[in-house]
């Protein structure tokens, strides 16, 4: 028997339906569905994960920093509200014992490879190298059967290792830096306020803050524009002065005076026709930008909808950077199927009449997946939500446009001379629809048709007007523009960028759905980190590690090398942070707490009792290397008395002693009080 592991339950159902030579048998174990199917004389069990079944967590339970000693644990232990994953882990564990072979059929990307790798290693208890790999970009029967017939001999260890490295680095950065910020505020104010930053989150917030500063520091400058209002065949037209901005009011007045004294005539007419090729196939970033422009969808919403369309089998895998379609894709069959939908029939029939179907393609490639395309599976009534219908329509129309003829646009520029001054009258129109006939609803072209002019023609001037304007600050980023900026900077991935933006909203660092404004909290976090530990928010450092994770994928670096380098780098950053922890905490606490005094005071140590050896104070200390807390004598290094202590909970002195004079303390954690002697040899332990 063979166990096929899908990423999600609905995908497992699709795979079972595609591979089964007869109707799949649906069964459940621990309430989790799985399928028994027969293919090529073999019995298959098709089961699923439910996204990530395993996450990273510290091996020891303490809230200090830095912490690098982490391990993979079930996701319901690593994260809150993930109890639903428990039964899926149990199901895979039991089913794995029934089979001899394994096939990973998760999404073919770094996250899918990590899901498959960890499910095999920890839930199934087998060496991941034993598993074969189904590789597909669409959940149609033909794609899944093709993946079955062309199984990869192993999972893609390059992608798996790169994905594991990314998870570890994100954990190192996110958890350690967030703990550092939280500890800093606690030290300065005595209050627990959780702040977060991350490996990509920080640099992203930084460029948003930089734009906010540009806007805040912007000083508008006055300028003047001059317009010439003319009449032609009863139609009023407005021509613009050859200089788009005049910085002197006196100069503007002079021009107006001179124009009023002059006769106006047409001095030149320039007509150009330009072919506009169809837009290239959708990669995820372009789809997110177009959907934002057309529907106002956030990048996260677009990705979620595109993922749903993929899982329903109507479009291909969305997390791609490719602008190229598969060479073996049956374009004619897909278009024939699309022609069954009335809204696309005229365009599909036009294409089906062509002897050859050759799509326009872009330059970008993705080794894992092609550009996004409709699979040819046709949605039935009620299959799609309203938002899914919108995005599906955009994807289908874009696909059809790829095969159509270029559009032709005509631009006309009429130059009007009034004395020594030139004014420009511009018009533009579409003279051949081409691909615009199918995709024009998502492309905004100005259509301005001018009446016919002749060179030397006298022009009737109705008005010459001078308008005062002011320069405007740079525009704030839209959500779609943030994704584009992250792409340009080389930070984040196609799969993570939208979620990083959502995290910044959730943390209260930014606000505004269409025009993103950084909040005072977001401004203060970046201002403080820039001042004391600028490397935390370095775009260059983040981009460098992104490049190294690509090298892991290519097999040119090992994950261990990159993880160790990251650990060394982050340790240095955190050492610098600890030196300035109180100052950082004071700056941040003023905005998140509000009642912190300006003077810097050293935090009073917690005294738990007297040293039985020298009579000094026994105080709570922190190991500079590990961040772990312990109890030690205030007279160190003259006195070397130390005691270990639990790493979680509030420490409350009791003024009592126990074994050999060791103090007794109360550890208060999650509403529970535990009274303990600090001597680990005490029988009460």
Swiss-Prot record:
Region (Interaction with DNA): 196-201
InterPro entries: Topo_IA, Topo_IA_2, Topo_IA_AS, Topo_IA_cen, Topo_IA_cen_sub1, Topo_IA_cen_sub2, Topo_IA_cen_sub3, Topo_IA_core_domain
Binding site for Mg(2+): 7, 107
Cofactor(s) the protein needs: Mg(2+)
Molecular-function annotations in GO: DNA binding; DNA topoisomerase type I (single strand cut, ATP-independent) activity; zinc ion binding
Active site: 317 (o-(5'-phospho-dna)-tyrosine intermediate)
UniProt family annotation: Belongs to the type IA topoisomerase family.
Enzyme class: isomerase
The reaction(s) this protein catalyses: ATP-independent breakage of single-stranded DNA, followed by passage and rejoining
Domain called Topo IA-type catalytic: residue spans: 156-574
Domain of life: Archaea
One Gene Ontology CC term in the entry: chromosome
Domain Toprim: 1-141
Functional note: Releases the supercoiling and torsional tension of DNA, which is introduced during the DNA replication and transcription, by transiently cleaving and rejoining one strand of the DNA duplex. Introduces a single-strand break via transesterification at a target site in duplex DNA. The scissile phosphodiester is attacked by the catalytic tyrosine of the enzyme, resulting in the formation of a DNA-(5'-phosphotyrosyl)-enzyme intermediate and the expulsion of a 3'-OH DNA strand. The free DNA strand then undergoes passage around the unbroken strand, thus removing DNA supercoils.
Organism: Pyrococcus abyssi (strain GE5 / Orsay)
ZnF bounds (C4-type): 611-639, 658-682
Site positions (Interaction with DNA): 52, 166, 170, 319, 507
Gene3D superfamilies for this protein: 3.40.50.140, Bacterial Topoisomerase I, domain 1 (3.30.65.10), Topoisomerase I, domain 2 (1.10.460.10), Topoisomerase I, domain 3 (2.70.20.10), Topoisomerase I, domain 4 (1.10.290.10)
Subunit text: Monomer.
Name of the protein: DNA topoisomerase 1
Enzyme Commission designation: 5.6.2.1
Swiss-Prot/TrEMBL keywords: DNA-binding, Isomerase, Magnesium, Metal-binding, Repeat, Topoisomerase, Zinc, Zinc-finger
Any one Gene Ontology BP term: DNA recombination
């Amino acid at each position: 028997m063979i166990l096929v592991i899908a990423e999600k339950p609905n995908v497992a159902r699709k795979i079972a339906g595609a591979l089964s030579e007869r109707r799949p048998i649906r069964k459940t174990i621990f309430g989790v569905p799985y399928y028994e199917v027969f293919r090529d004389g073999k019995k298959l069990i098709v089961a699923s994960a439910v996204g990530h079944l395993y996450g990273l967590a510290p091996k020891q339970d303490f809230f200090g920093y830095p912490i690098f000693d982490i391990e993979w644990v079930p996701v319901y232990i690593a994260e809150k509200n993930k109890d639903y994953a428990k039964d899926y882990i149990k199901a895979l564990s039991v089913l794995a014992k029934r089979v001899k072979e394994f096939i990973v059929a998760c999404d073919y990307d770094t996250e899918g490879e990590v899901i498959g790798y960890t499910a095999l290693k920890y839930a199934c208890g087998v060496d991941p190298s034993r598993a074969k790999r189904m590789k597909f970009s669409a959940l149609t029967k033909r794609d899944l059967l093709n993946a079955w017939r062309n199984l990869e001999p192993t999972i893609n260890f390059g992608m798996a290792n790169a994905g594991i490295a990314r998870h570890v680095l994100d954990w190192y950065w996110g958890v350690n830096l967030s703990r550092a910020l939280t500890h800093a505020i606690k030290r300065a104010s005595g209050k627990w306020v959780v702040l977060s930053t991350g490996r990509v989150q920080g640099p992203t917030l930084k460029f948003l803050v930089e734009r906010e500063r540009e806007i805040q520091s912007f000083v508008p400058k006055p300028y003047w524009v001059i317009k010439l209002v003319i009449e032609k065949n009863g139609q009023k037209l407005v021509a613009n002065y050859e200089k788009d901005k005049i910085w002197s009011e006196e100069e503007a007045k002079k021009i107006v005076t001179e124009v009023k004294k002059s006769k106006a005539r047409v001095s030149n007419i320039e007509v150009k026709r330009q072919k506009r090729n169809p837009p290239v196939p959708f990669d995820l970033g372009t789809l997110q930008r177009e959907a934002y422009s057309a529907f106002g969808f956030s990048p996260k919403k677009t990705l979620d909808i595109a993922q749903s369309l993929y899982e329903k089998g109507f479009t291909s895998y969305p997390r791609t950077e490719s602008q190229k379609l598969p060479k073996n894709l049956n374009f004619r069959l897909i278009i024939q199927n699309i022609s069954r939908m009335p809204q696309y029939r005229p365009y599909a029939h036009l294409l089906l009449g062509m002897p050859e179907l050759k799509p326009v393609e872009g330059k970008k490639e993705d080794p894992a997946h092609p550009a996004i395309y409709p699979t040819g599976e046709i949605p039935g009534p009620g299959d799609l939500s309203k938002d899914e219908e919108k995005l599906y329509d955009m994807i289908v129309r874009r696909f059809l446009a790829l095969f159509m003829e270029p559009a032709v646009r005509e631009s006309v520029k009429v130059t009007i001379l009034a004395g020594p001054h030139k004014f420009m009258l511009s018009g533009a129109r579409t003279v051949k629809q081409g691909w615009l006939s199918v995709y024009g609803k998502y492309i905004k072209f100005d259509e301005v048709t001018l009446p016919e002019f002749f060179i030397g023609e006298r022009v009737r001037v109705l008005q010459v007007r001078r308008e005062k304007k002011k320069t405007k600050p740079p525009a704030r980023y839209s959500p779609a523009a943030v994704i584009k900026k992250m792409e340009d900077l080389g930070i984040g991935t196609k799969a993570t960028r939208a979620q990083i933006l959502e995290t910044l909203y959730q943390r209260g660092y930014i606000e505004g759905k269409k025009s993103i404004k950084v909040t005072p909290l977001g401004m203060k976090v970046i201002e403080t980190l820039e001042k004391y530990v600028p490397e935390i928010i370095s775009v260059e450092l983040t981009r460098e590690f992104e490049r190294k994770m690509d090298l892991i994928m290519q097999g040119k670096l090992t994950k261990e090398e990159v993880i160790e380098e990251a650990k060394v780098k982050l340790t240095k950053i955190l050492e610098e942070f600890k030196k300035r922890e109180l100052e950082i905490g004071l700056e941040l606490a003023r905005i998140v707490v509000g009642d912190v005094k300006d003077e810097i005071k050293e935090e009073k140590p917690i005294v738990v009792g007297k040293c039985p050896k020298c009579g000094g104070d026994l105080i709570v200390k922190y190991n500079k290397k590990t961040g772990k807390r312990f109890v030690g004598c205030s007279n160190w290094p003259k006195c070397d008395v130390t005691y270990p202590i639990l790493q979680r909970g509030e420490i409350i002195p009791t003024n009592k002693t126990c074994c050999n004079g060791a103090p007794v303390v109360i550890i208060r954690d999650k509403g529970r009080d535990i009274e303990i002697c600090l001597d680990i040899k005490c029988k009460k332990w």
